[in-house]
């Protein structure tokens, strides 16, 4: 998760079709999209300079020729009332702050989780093992639930956990797993406890909660459920772009995607005299799905919401949106009050509230169950 940028873009942006390949072939270049149709070729170093200045982007270097970003999404009817309160409340009762603290302590202990580093590969492997353990412990694997790697052209892989339902329509919850030290991406210490270890372990604990429901475990939910952990988000939403482009090409149907990017920091709100709240992202999301998310929060969570905007390509929900799938995003706070330690070696567990992270986990359990069951 990053702040909306007011950075003035020095180079002239061009359309994707008009973006010529850079002449200098000695330095690797990447094609990035800073706004719809506005692209530029940059070096890896220039990528991180943009990030340090708060400018988000899609890295579209490997985008298929002929790809067209979705300008509209198919209409989806979302529930307008709560239907599974007893089941959701039973699952919520099993959520554990202790589990999240244990998992985040381990996940943030990797030197970094940079998408090109061995640490990024090791952390993804460890995370996938925890997902597999949750599935196996629930017995859902006996009914077709599974976890799989989604490989990329860099060493860190994305992770997809699938709990089959009666239909192939998919309800997705996602979070990016990588971290970055903005000053030294490859070798710098980047615990990434909040950005985005918090989101990664929050959805992991929510998965454990969802797997307490035998209807879901036994594949009897109306829709299929997927939990995603994306690789390479910091480098331009690489993992989520690849997955949702693959889904688009395969003709998969996604009923809704909820993104969790930074779920643990509340000090910024409290210091401003605000109540602890969710930050509801209102730009580059599906309005109807966001309305549904508000209903889930009001029913199952104990904190209010504040509307906020995060800008173009700010996190992985934008990849779903760009490929024509309805998405929503809920952050730990309004964007201007996010954790100031992100992308540094001080993004540690010490600054986080696990009570707040439990609120996010409750949201996820409610979202998945009300939409899939």
Swiss-Prot record:
Subcellular localization: Secreted
Coiled-coil positions: none
Enzyme class: hydrolase
Residue positions the entry lists as glycosylated: 196, 286
GO terms, biological process: proteolysis
Entry-linked CDD domains: M28_AAP
InterPro entries: M28_fam, Peptidase_M28
Domain of life, per lineage: Eukaryota
Pfam families the record matches: Peptidase_M28
EC number: 3.4.11.-
Keyword Hydrolase in record: yes
Bridged cysteine pairs (disulfide): 310-314
Annotated Zn(2+) 2 binding sites: 195, 234, 343
GO molecular function per UniProt: aminopeptidase activity; metal ion binding; metalloexopeptidase activity
Annotated family: Belongs to the peptidase M28 family. M28E subfamily.
Assembly and oligomerization: Monomer.
Protein name, entry field: Leucine aminopeptidase 1
């Amino acid at each position: 998760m990053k702040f909306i940028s007011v950075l003035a873009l020095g180079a002239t942006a061009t359309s994707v079709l008009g973006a010529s390949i850079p002449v200098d072939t000695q330095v690797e270049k990447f094609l990035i999209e800073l706004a719809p149709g506005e692209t530029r070729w940059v070096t890896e170093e220039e990528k991180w300079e943009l990030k340090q200045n708060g400018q988000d982007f899609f890295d579209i270097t490997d985008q298929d020729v002929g790809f067209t970003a979705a300008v509209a999404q198919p209409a989806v009817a979302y529930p307008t009332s709560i239907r599974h309160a007893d089941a959701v409340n039973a699952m919520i009762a099993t959520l554990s702050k202790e589990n999240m603290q244990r998992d985040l302590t381990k996940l943030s202990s990797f030197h970094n989780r940079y998408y090109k580093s061995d640490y990024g590969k090791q952390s993804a492997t460890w995370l996938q093992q925890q997902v597999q353990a949750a599935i196996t412990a629930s017995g859902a694997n006996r009914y077709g639930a599974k976890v799989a790697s989604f490989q990329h052209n860099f060493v860190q892989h994305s992770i997809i956990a699938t709990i089959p339902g009666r239909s192939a329509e998919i309800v997705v919850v996602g979070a990016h797993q990588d971290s970055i030290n903005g000053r030294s991406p490859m070798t710098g210490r980047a615990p990434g406890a909040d950005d985005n270890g918090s989101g990664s372990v929050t959805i992991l604990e929510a998965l454990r909660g969802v797997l307490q429901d035998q209807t879901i475990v036994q594949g009897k939910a109306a829709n299929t459920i997927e939990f995603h952990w994306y690789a390479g988000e910091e480098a331009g939403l690489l993992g989520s772009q690849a997955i949702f482009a693959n889904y688009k090409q395969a003709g998969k149907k996604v009923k809704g995607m909820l993104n969790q990017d930074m779920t643990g920091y509340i000090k910024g709100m409290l210091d401003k005299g605000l109540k602890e709240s969710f930050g509801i992202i209102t730009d580059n999301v599906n309005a109807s799905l966001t309305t549904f998310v508000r209903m889930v929060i009001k029913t199952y969570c104990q904190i209010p919401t504040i509307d906020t905007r995060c800008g173009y390509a700010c996190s992985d929900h934008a990849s779903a949106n760009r490929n024509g799938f309805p998405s929503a995003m809920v952050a730990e706070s309004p964007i201007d009050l996010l954790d100031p330690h992100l992308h540094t070696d001080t993004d540690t567990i010490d600054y986080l509230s696990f009570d707040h992270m439990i609120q996010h986990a409750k949201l996820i359990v409610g979202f998945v169950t009300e939409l899939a069951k």
